């Protein structure tokens, strides 16, 4: 079995399972549908449940994905990532520092950082992030504080300056993913494109096929 950091580098598609967005699908059921596809990353993001509920959800997903090709990331909660031996944690701009997360989780775990401009991306890389997400590329209701999105030009700049894996994120779907790829992104992260799809697996396969042919 390859290390999860190796799988991170091979992954093209990053699925964010947000309980608020996936209102019609249980996270575990959704993960069980998609986990046997190409190497990918799944992040559990739940900002509405109490911590006990979140731990139960995360444990179920961790158990389902154990020994799979899927990298399992927990959003925000370093302590839950440590408790459940998740593959890593994703931190936003206001969360605990990357250095604290690294000290708690160790060098073998994956730490990702949300970035909205090139300076943030460079800082995250220099501080030892394993990957970054950069966005939102397009307008998305999930990021109302950046109503216009960051645009495709920033993807081009990140492509030229960032050496660690980066995932373009924000409003990306099958109708605009080729524009993102043409701007220099080899990897994308999506939420609504999978969580709100009528059938998650075909939707995932379609996006994955587009990414892997480029």
Task: Mark where each language-model region is.
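C-terminal binding/interaction regions
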Residues: 183
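Conserved N-terminal beta1-alpha1 strand-loop-helix module at the mouth
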Residues: 1-98, 102-131, 147-150, 157, ...
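Hydrophobic alpha-helix-in-membranes signature
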Residues: 135-138, 164
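A short acidic, helix-capping loop that chelates divalent metal ions and anchors anionic groups
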Residues: 81, 138-144
